[in-house]
A protein has these predicted regions:
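C-terminal regulatory/interaction module of P-loop NTP-utilizing enzymes
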Residues: 1-235
Length: 235
């Protein structure tokens, strides 16, 4: 293992750098799951991100016509772009918050995340049949904790699931040294959790208004206890 790399991140690294092409990263928000999906492993053929929402449509996944200079041009969706990669090798598809995908979109994603031998999509306008190129991989992220909340069909396609319970060490380096331990602990503190983004904002703000005022602004009635925790860590 690399020095100072938490177990969850070492697992992600081992998977994506050694041929695991279907991976779910789950756990509290703000830990770097999306960043890992976009950058870990071989992404030389490109990485494409979808963020699932209730109003997302299949056009975001497969493509649609868009107006351009008085005409209509076909623009492929993120999944097809990931399938095609660089034209020789498939790229990476990162689907954020997969649990928020609507029914139609979810069904389309499932079909596109089937085995390479079975997955295909026909462009309804041109009749061209697309299939994932060799090397295509997919990473799903979700903030839910219980994988039983995800449909069985998705779980079947993604046998490897890693809970990310700590910020990546590289992300923690953005914080001043005195904040890194407490920020790492609070990332996975259940209902009391504080995101890494909030700590970064606090770090920036305290430089101008002082730590007490910055804590009051960012953390409200928890400010005093968090300042105490920072003080203890500094000892």
């Amino acid at each position: 293992m690399e020095k100072n790399l938490p177990k969850c991140w070492q697992t992600v690294k081992d998977c994506l750098e050694n041929g695991i092409d279907r991976l779910i990263l789950f756990g509290p928000p703000g830990t770097g799951k999306t960043f890992a999906g976009l950058h870990y492993g071989n992404v030389s053929a490109g990485a494409h991100r979808l963020v699932c929402t209730d109003d997302m449509t299949n056009a975001d996944v497969t493509g649609t016509y868009i107006p351009s200079a008085g005409d209509w041009n076909w623009q492929y969706g993120k999944a097809i772009k990931a399938w095609e990669g660089d034209g020789v090798n498939g790229g990476r598809l990162v689907v954020d918050e997969i649990d928020k995908a609507g029914g139609d979109v979810f069904a389309t994603l499932l079909s596109m995340l089937d085995s390479p031998e079975s997955a295909s999509w026909e462009n309804p306008e041109t009749g061209r049949v697309h299939r994932p190129r060799q090397g295509f991989s997919a990473v799903m992220t979700t903030n839910i904790e219980d994988m039983r909340e995800l449909p069985d069909a998705l779980i079947d396609r993604f046998p490897v699931r890693v809970r990310i319970d700590q910020p990546h060490p590289d992300a923690l380096q953005r914080l001043s040294p005195d904040l890194r331990n407490v920020a790492s602990r609070m990332c996975d503190a259940g209902d009391r959790r504080i995101s890494l983004r909030a700590w970064i904002t606090f770090d920036d703000l305290r430089a101008s208004v002082g730590k007490e005022r910055a804590a009051e602004i960012l953390f409200g009635d928890r400010a005093e206890s968090l300042i105490d925790a920072m003080t203890i860590d500094a000892i």
